[in-house]
């Protein structure tokens, strides 16, 4: 595998915790899912500790920090509570995301351009404890350029509009936006990741984009795991991504 065809898979295990929290039980354990994902080829584990604690809990994050063999990508809102927690646990990677209590999942990208100083301060605090920071943003040139200005080393492009496109023409337009976003981010020296809404039937065109470093995928893998098991679900997704990346 050459550097050009290398692509990483970050497995988001939030929805394993969603199933647990639905009944207030101790199972299924997202930590076990994370370890299974690593054994199946995941390059990292993503968790989002939301303000309302609807799925992942602080204990999950603390245990994962101690047991992961790969790395944790800690998704977090830009709040003092989350910044203080991240400074305590020192995740290898952290991703700043927008967050609203009423949303089912993260609905759009972070408005970096509209709050540059606030984001710059958060990036500095996280970098000071050794965490590589990415910003979850729409594939919008204004937001990509702002991300570079605030000092973030990485961005994660929101692929939700591509994933939700209702016809082939719209999907093609949104895929082109992602392609252009990747190219711009790379030209500015940013590491470019992507994710949101990706599944087994739409991941390949995104994985084939030259310059994408990593895809973060969760819901589709957790859903597929109900039928084939967690390790198999992760392995199938990784295989699709690697096959697509060879076409770059």
From Swiss-Prot:
It comes from the Bacteria. It catalyses: 3-amino-2-oxopropyl phosphate + 1-deoxy-D-xylulose 5-phosphate = pyridoxine 5'-phosphate + phosphate + 2 H2O + H(+). Pfam families: PdxJ (PF03740). The record marks 156 as: Transition state stabilizer. GO terms for cellular component: cytosol. Pathway: Cofactor biosynthesis; pyridoxine 5'-phosphate biosynthesis; pyridoxine 5'-phosphate from D-erythrose 4-phosphate: step 5/5. 1-deoxy-D-xylulose 5-phosphate binds at residues 14-15, 50, 55, 105. Its main location: cytoplasm. 3-amino-2-oxopropyl phosphate binds at residues 12, 23, 197, 218-219. Keywords: Cytoplasm, Pyridoxine biosynthesis, Transferase. One of its GO terms (biological process) is pyridoxine biosynthetic process. Catalyzes the complicated ring closure reaction between the two acyclic compounds 1-deoxy-D-xylulose-5-phosphate (DXP) and 3-amino-2-oxopropyl phosphate (1-amino-acetone-3-phosphate or AAP) to form pyridoxine 5'-phosphate (PNP) and inorganic phosphate. Belongs to the PNP synthase family. This is Pyridoxine 5'-phosphate synthase. The gene is pdxJ.
